[in-house]
Swiss-Prot record:
GO terms for cellular component: chloroplast; cytosol. Keywords: Amino-acid biosynthesis, Branched-chain amino acid biosynthesis, Chloroplast, Plastid, Transferase. Residues 4-78 form the ACT domain. Belongs to the acetolactate synthase small subunit family. It comes from Galdieria sulphuraria. This is Acetolactate synthase small subunit. GO terms for biological process: isoleucine biosynthetic process; L-valine biosynthetic process. NCBIfam families: acolac_sm (TIGR00119), PRK11895.1 (NF008864). It is found in: Plastid, Chloroplast. InterPro entries: Acetalactate_synth_ssu (IPR004789), Acetolactate_synth/TF_NikR_C (IPR027271), Acetolactate_synth_ssu_C (IPR019455), ACT-like_dom_sf (IPR045865), ACT_dom (IPR002912), AHAS_ACT (IPR039557), AHAS_small-like_ACT (IPR054480).
Amino acid sequence: MKHTLSVLVEDESGVLTRISGLFARRGFNIDSLAVGPAEKAGISRITMVIRGDNRIIEQITKHLYKLVNVLKIQDITNIPCVERELMLIKVKTGENKRNEILEIANIFRARVVDLSESFIILEITGDPGKIAAIEKLLEKYGICEIARTGKIALTRESKINTEILRLNTMINNDKIRGGGT
């Protein structure tokens, strides 16, 4: 199972090296890693996705807390949260495929950031499912390059799961169109 950990650390030189060294020594793999400044000066937030059962995640957490600059660790896997990734994707295009690709981009609210006779580069932001879906749809056109950030996430204060919000929106949209009761 994939787990998402949110780790607050002091913004000091070598912190990320010590964390990645710990993972390497223990034989753990990091699927996704994103690091950036947190809400407080001098503090960074690391969002990492790791594969493992609860026992492995507990073990990783204990080892991380032993590192000097680690302040707080939270496994947010089963907590309602907002998750986002950013992907830049370069796709082969020609005059006959361009409109189809632009239509897909429009549906996914992707932005065209570069366009030439032979290629198009799109910028897509969304949850990991949205990113995977557009990538899958664009495969048939010929993906040349992909650059993807790691997942970033913050817990929801409303404690409402994204899937519940999405389902509720679909039901309400259906009622507006006259399909509901």
